[in-house]
Structure formats: structure tokens, C-alpha cells
Amino acid sequence: MIASIERATRAGGRFGAHRLTFIAVAALVAAACGTEDAADPLEPNGPAGRIRFVNLITDPTRNPVNAILEGVPFGVGLGYTQSTPATLPAPSTANYSAVLAGDRTIVLKRTADTTVTVGTLNISVAANNDYTVFATGGTGGSAVTAFLTGDVNTPVPTGQVRIRVVNMSPAAGTVDVFITAPNADLATATPAATALAIRTIFPGVTVAPGSYQVRTVPAGTPPAGRAAAVNTSFTTPAAIAAGGSRTIVLADAPAGGAPPRSFQLTDQ
């Protein structure tokens, strides 16, 4: 299968476009997804938005999954907390993929048996907007559904980086968020966000380039008790360069519940 997808990139607040041609990559993913060759319906010849998909399905028996966006392979073998298109092989790797504006569908198939549909996610995409599509649910055989966040990816101020947080962890509950230098004393730290509820986005802070540790504690934890109460902690694996943007996601354990964890998505 040879599929051409028009990818949109932001420039000065507008979408520019450049064409990426998938040859071996598309053929490999199509075979893994068990799909038929078909004309690519995702070439944005009209108004387009951008999306990325994140697997937060808390049912190990249904993971990993293949994601099929509007009939076109979008990701294969996506384990818990993995995302696409970030995990696609080069040259298809990207932070987001372009898709025509309007109502769209992502079908999730079990990688080990692509005759099994894990979930069908219906989303609505507005032109010139970025979205993260989280596949959620699955614990105890429950249904898999979509939770959509609108991602504001305006240019980061010169010489700064942006760090935002999304709470997708029922086990973590409502939290206070601390964004500090690694191993900084939480007793004297000022929270970047307080009372961040489940399925809520903290739009972020802009800080100097460097490495950061993002920690959460149950909302209202007194300063002296914060270090012992940390329920998620993520340290950026490398220093974030100027102009970069990251989203830290709080999530439950792979089968649901505790212990919660956190991981990083690259925005810019």
C-alpha cells in the first residue's frame, strides 16, 4: 500500500502543508492492522485540524491495539500509554497528524487478533485546532471510550519552554501539581496548579529551558507532608530546549487503579 498524507504544520498561527509519502511504513502498518488497500481519505484538501492518539485502555487482555483512522492505518502495536504518530517509524514520526475537519472515527483493533474490535471512537475535529484523543476505560471488561482534549500549541515565548499537565488518573484523584528542578524540596515549593481534578487540563507554565520534575500530591496536602504524599513523579529524560513544549499525563496502572503514574507527550 502506498498512501500519501498531507500533514499540516503550524506557522504563524496558520497551517502550512507539506506532503509525506508513506511507502514501506504504510505497507507494514496496513499488514499489521489487517486492513485492505484503499484510497487515502485523509489528504486534507480542505480545512484541517491535527490529532494524536494515546492508549489509556486499562485492560491488559485487550492491549496492545492497532489504531485505524478513517480506514487508514494510524498506529500498530500500541501498548498502554503509547501514542501515535509519535511512535510511527521515520519519516512518518510526528507530534500530530493532519486530518480533515469534521466528524472522524478511530477504530481500535486488538493487535494479537485484528478480528477483535476493542473500541470505536467518534471525534469531532475543528479546522486549525490540535487535539489529543485518549482511549479510556476497559477495567473489568468495561467499554472503551474517547476523551478529547483541545491542545493550545501557540508559539512558546522566545527563550522559554512550556510544560502542561493533564490528569487522566482516577487513582490519583484531585491533585496539586509541582513543577520544579529535579529533587527540589517540596516543602518550600509553590504549586504550579492546585486542585487539578480528574479529566482536567492545567494549561501550563513557561519556564527556562532545562530538566524538570513534575510531581503531584493529593490536593491540600500540607507542605511538611508533601514529600511522603507524592503519588506521581516524572522527570524529563533530557533537558527541554528553548521553544519546546511537553504535556505530562497522569494515568492509572495498566489494569486500572493504583499506583498511578505519569508520562510525557511532546507537543512542540
Region locations from a protein language model:
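Intrinsically disordered, low-complexity polar regions and short flexible loop motifs
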Residues: 33-268
